[in-house]
Amino acid sequence: MLEARDLYCERDERTLFRGLSFTVDAGEWVQVTGGNGAGKTTLLRLLTGLARPDGGEVYWQGEPLRRVRDSFHRSLLWIGHQPGIKTRLTARENLHFFHPGDGARLPEALAQAGLAGFEDVPVARLSAGQQRRVALARLWLTRAALWVLDEPFTAIDVNGVARLTRRMAAHTAQGGMVILTTHQPLPGAADTVRRLALTTALVLYALRANIDLFYTPGEILYGKRETQQLPAVGQRLRVGGMVMPGSVRRDPDSLKVNFSLYDAEGSVTVSYEGILPDLFREGQGVVVQGTLEKGNHVLAHEVLAKHDENYTPPEVEKAMQENHRRPQRVDKDTSS
């Protein structure tokens, strides 16, 4: 099992992610998604030990990665955005370099990758897509349990993507693990791949079965704009919205507090037990992390606020722009 625990990463004085926690068990594969600059490649480098996080830890089989680096790397196949092959060698020679004991299997691996007839052509004479296939032919040779692949389908045609996806599915069916970044759909695998969506500067969690991680109140009520899919009761999620004026109710004998979050589409109720951020204010934007309960209620385990009286969570702002309006300020709780 690979585990990311409370990962925090900054680049160029910008927070890419913080509090990022998830696990990848035997037989699972995870697709990391996000816009340019969201930190997808950086996350993969942290997971493979090629870079160190600014906070948090990566664990392999229950042990900190830094303590079991050698055994981890024996279990890892890493193919980065660049093919990582030697252009002066042929396709066959490149595979032999990585898999010297598998000479008899090299032609079949290259054929599976779509390179039949190109085995002895110098890689420098191959197209970008063919060079990528040389690197990906290792998927038919490696005995590594964990595959971490950064944009593996770059310059690969539709048939090649389908063939590679089938290979990944076979690997996970045999108990392997796959983590990849890609903007392309995974033919035949949409129901089995977990998606982890990175949104700059937010705490993110890997959820099950292709559910986006962030919701606005309106999306909880009516579903995502693209799919109309509602979050499931019991699902861990993040909700960003404005704290409804007049909705905050504090228990005088404990740290329990209830309030409502709203956007232009509606409102949801939130309960939380703990110390609220100093910057928590009615009428201002916050992001809560928690679990969705019945009745569109969120049981929160963390509340985040930002030092800006005009702050609106970025995802809420985007949703409002798509709807051509911002959330209206309200004077009372209208969630009931």
UniProtKB/Swiss-Prot annotation:
Q: Where is this region: Cytochrome c biogenesis ATP-binding export protein CcmA 2?
A: 1-199
**One GO CC term, this protein:** plasma membrane
Please name every pair of cysteines joined by a disulfide bond in this record: none
Annotated residues for binding of heme? H307, Y311
Q: Which InterPro entries match?
A: AAA+_ATPase, ABC_transporter-like_ATP-bd, ABC_transporter-like_CS, ABC_transptr_haem_export_CcmA, CcmE, CcmE-like_sf, NA-bd_OB-fold, P-loop_NTPase
What biological-process GO terms show up in the record?
A: cytochrome complex assembly
Tell me the protein family, please: In the N-terminal section; belongs to the ABC transporter superfamily. CcmA exporter (TC 3.A.1.107) family. In the C-terminal section; belongs to the CcmE/CycJ family.
Could you tell me which NCBIfam families the record lists for this protein? Answer: ccmA, PRK13150.1, PRK13165.1, PRK13538.1
Q: What is this protein called?
A: Putative bifunctional cytochrome c-type biogenesis protein CcmAE
